[in-house]
Amino acid sequence: FRVELLAGLCVSWGLYNMDFDDLIKEAQRRTTSPNGVYSAKIMWSSFQDVLIERLKPRDSSDPSGSSDSSQFPSSSLCLSILKAHFPDPRFLWIRRRNKVAQAISLYRASFSNVFHHRRQRKKNEKDPPPYDFTKIESKLQFIEECESQWQKFFSENRLEPLILYYEDFCESLEDTLLIILKYLGERAAERGIPKITPNLLKMADSTSKEWELRFRKEREGN
């Protein structure tokens, strides 16, 4: 639900002058699986700044009792807005144990504007940005804040998301998919999962590892 990705979808689908609500419906129509499953990846920043703000009815009242329209809606209102557009939502919360490595990846991706690399495409060989402790620390704080906000959203709505760790599905994608299918109640889980070749490649490299060691040493020294 990043704005630039949504704009790209509109162009690729040949859709113009479509409001956000209709775009969501069109995305569901085009990408829902034959057995009725629709999935979307939502980062907290997109959840806050794009999805909820654009889908929130202008005259909606906040169940928390807050009347300040300048404040981000309460967790209960956010959930009710989601349910109005995505009935019976199930939440898969993807986290990362090594948040320093995640912060380094985010810093590098933000600098190059390359957030993923597909197996079928030639790798973008842009030079990495210069090492910057302050900027990596800023990304780390951003990641921790986003995770804190998701935790608040789930806790206040008494939701129990399926928690998945990046490191685990990198180790065994098939095992992770089985866990997801069982969580969703899909019978395909009973038949097992064949070996899968991921479409996306890991972008971390030796530079990422060197930076992590350097960052941890500098952080311990502060």
Where do the model's predicted regions map?
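PAPS-dependent sulfotransferase catalytic core
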Residues: F1-G36, P63-S66, K122-E137, D168, I196-S206, ...
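Acidic-residue sensor for enzyme active/binding pockets
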Residues: E4, E147, E167
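Secondary-structure boundary motif
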Residues: R29-S33, A84, K152-E156, K217-E220
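PAPS-dependent sulfotransferase catalytic domain
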Residues: S39-I163, E171-E190
